[in-house]
Amino acid sequence: MSDQAKNGIVDIPSNHSVDATVEKLKGILNSKGVMLFALVDHSGEAAKAGLKMPPTKLLIFGSPKAGTPVMLAAPSIAIDLPLKILVWQDANGKVWISSNSPQYLKERHNVPDDLIKNIAAVEALATAAAS
């Protein structure tokens, strides 16, 4: 079993900086009519507290039209929705796009097969932003 399969996180390398990757993601979400609920700048908040960390930003996004049927069928998934994508820079300067694996969420919350498509687009979003 791969590390990704064990922890449910998919990591995709980005060809861009954290800020450029975040901007690409915001543009993709906007073009698809997906709502960006919040953008958390972890590294910016760390700096305000006098601490240093590599650039790290979390996008929280979703579509009530897509997510609500999933939550009705599997209420515990509400702890993992809205969907999240983490864009972060590792100690070597490489930028990554990380998200929960839809398959992991399916298994974790027993999401019916016919509804997993409602949240599976997260991987395509991350892949599009990485290139």
Predicted regions mapped to residue ranges:
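Terminal, regulation- and interaction-focused segments at domain boundaries
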Residues: 1-33
